[in-house]
Amino acid sequence: MAGAGLSVSRAAAADKVTIALIPGLTADGFYVTMHKGAEAAAKALGIDLLYQGAAEWNVSLQVPILDAIIGKKPAAILIAPNDKTQLIKPLKKAYDAGIAVVCVDTFIGNGVFQTGSGEADFPISYVASDNVLGGRMAARALAKSIGEKGKVYVSNVKPNISTTDQREEGFKDEMKKYSGIQVIETQFNDDDANKAAAQAQAVIGRVSDLAGIFGANLFSALGAANGVKAAGKRGQIKLAAFDAPESITNQLKDGTFELTIAQHPAEIGYFGLVSAYAYATKNPVPTAIGTGFTVMTKDNIDDPNVAKYIYKSS
């Protein structure tokens, strides 16, 4: 199990611990669901949970929120850093103030912590999905759906975001196994679904044998889908998504998407909080905790064991 090796008990009221969670952004079902998982752990362990984030994925918005949280002096901060390089120094301020740092979903540096080397070594743990594996899973499923031939591309946010970088890496590496498939240039959309839609229409206009698109995050996938529909190619160009809010899963049911890779964000939030609490109460903490995936398709989305991983909207 993902949290194996973590052993903690509920705090007495006099020893109540405060831990903060800063999501990548608040307006995303993934982080809403992560927050729910963290709340469940906080309730179970008697923790005061602070939750604050920006409405969009933006370093210049996340850093002031981080600074404000540091000023409240929690025992630990769980954070999904908006950039793996630009958040190193701001998070080092938390560490220097005696606040433990746990990276959830995204990471700083190379995501390998507590090794004794490097400027981004100080977080105590990284709790997340294996995003390279997730990208590979998307590639395998998309390759099958297009008959292992044709051109595909990745619709992505921007470089230097750890998770989406890794999803693209895994996708492209896995696609090398299919000689009949050519991966063409990635389209970066700055997390703007409208831009992703326009890019999809432009690629469709110039690549006559485009067979599929992999949307590496929510807005990349939604935008690509809108572009495909606007071009009149729904069902002809196969779409693979990453993440599972209802805005994606409803379009699995109607055939717009072939599949989506659902992460388990509630587990990330839960085990992230447990890790931070374990450290604050002087218990051992693994430096990395992995959570799983569920591949969702039109054929399995109504299965309760699959549907339970659809992200919460509120």
Pin down the residues of each PLM region.
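N-terminal export signals
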Residues: 1-9
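A residue-level marker of the well-folded mature domains of exported/periplasmic proteins
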Residues: 12-314
